[in-house]
Amino acid sequence: MSSVAVIGAGAWGSALAIQAARAGNDVTLWARDAARARLMAASRENPRLAGVRLPEQIRVTPAFPSAADFTLLAVPTQHLRALLGRLPAALAPLVVCAKGVEAETLRLPQEIVAEGRPGVAAAVLTGPNFAHEIAAGLPAASVVAAANAELREAVAAALSTPAFRLYGNDDPVGAQVGGAAKNVVAIAAGAVIGAGLGENARAALITRGLAELARLAVALGGRRETVMGLSGLGDLLLTCTGAASRNYSLGLALGRGEALADALAARSAVIEGVATAPALVARAAGVDMPICTAVASLLAGQTTLGEAITALLTRPRRDE
């Protein structure tokens, strides 16, 4: 048994806490809001995961734990740096469970950790996982990416169960690129379906989006084959087709003609692709990423959906 701290009591953090407890660990789940922590501790449920009970070995608290064998960081990428400044120094190693690119610095999550906690060992947990399915114990697979083989094996061993299979990978850059860029492509996939352009168009967009993920991963020092696995292709397929995908849902709304502000106001959860799109395009300077660039322009109000679609469809033909 290990002691696991999960920092962030949203749907994803709570699902990870449930999985860690299911794997036999002693778990502390940190919630930023004290009232929410009390409610979850008393009801043994997170309202965002209605119907799923928090196991008794999960302690919900608004106070940071003083120590843990592993600390899972399950807060949005845009809030990760500020959190690191408050986190007790004894909490290490760290497992980054966020996806995206920091808007201000263009850093990937593990890069933020390296700057905020220099010298601390860190891994990345990423893959095609919806929080409610993980919490419910449905079968899933994911990736623990870290250059340190002992760390990734230890994290995988601590969190794995027969229904939650964790694979190791020594390419955290490629794994993070897949997790970040797929949210942007998912907005485009939703817009295609929302606009009534059909399943053929979505399939083409997902496939060409995967090519963009691979080009960016290689440009940033990752490997193409990493993007072809769970952290890239797997996550891309789920996020571009799953009804529970927040980024895909936003794209659907935009494709149906909703204004971005209205679509965001109707959704309480963080839609990471909105902040990630412009940061990703900026980080990818010099890399050919027409789909992600079109999404960033659409979200910034620099182009209409019709103009973006026309621009993509009229690009010069080339070999695949």
Predicted ranges, named:
Residues 1-53, 59-62:
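NAD(P)+-binding Rossmann beta1-loop-alpha1 motif at the extreme N-terminus of oxidoreductases
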